[in-house]
Amino acid sequence: GDDDFGRFLKETLEEHGVRRIISRLCQEAVTTMAFVTLSPDGDRSFTFARKPGADMFIREDDVREDDIRESVIIHAGSCSLSASPAAEATVRSLRLGREMGKLVSFDVNYRDVMWKGDQDACAARVTEVLPYVDLVKISDAEAGMLGGEANIPEMMKRYGLTAVVETMGGDGAKCYFNDKVLFAAAVKGNC
């Protein structure tokens, strides 16, 4: 959004050399904000200020082929698939990235409030974009939406995924790659 938060995000990305493929700041809504609450046992819960949020107003015509062509990595997540016209713009970005031979990554990143509790709708949108994706980041809970952890190798074959990283909170993470499963232990954080 064209507000203090949106300008801060834009400047921070620029300072770190991250090129945005959507250059305009949205006039129709404010920047979507996420508020994270930690429970005593370390579980996170999310609340979003997004009624509507600027991210929901990204349009297909905002996605320019030249920007995709000049990119190295195209990354998106399911939050941008939860509302039109951003969903169509996201699909276009991922499709163009694939067609142009870019590394395409995708974070399933299911958030109940953004999908109004409809995991099936999220799973349907995610499987729609998987043919364009090389690398998927998914949590163990999100894997359940897509057939479960045991289905990850089959999902990789079906959609031509190069790697899937499954995060398991305090239990670490697994990386599925080249018919192998690699494990990394969790690192204790101070969040």
Q: Where on the chain are the PLM-derived regions?
A:
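Glycine-rich beta-alpha junction loops
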Residues: 1, 52, 110-112, 169-171, ...
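Conserved N-terminal subdomain of the carbohydrate kinase-like
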Residues: 1-78
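Short, hinge-like loop/turn segments at secondary-structure boundaries
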Residues: 12-15, 39-42, 121-125, 153-156, ...
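A short, aliphatic-rich alpha-helical micro-motif
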Residues: 67-69, 129-130, 158
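Conserved beta-alpha-beta core of the PfkB/ribokinase-like small-molecule kinase fold
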Residues: 79-154, 171-173
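Conserved phosphate-binding/catalytic region of the ribokinase-like
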Residues: 95-99, 149-191
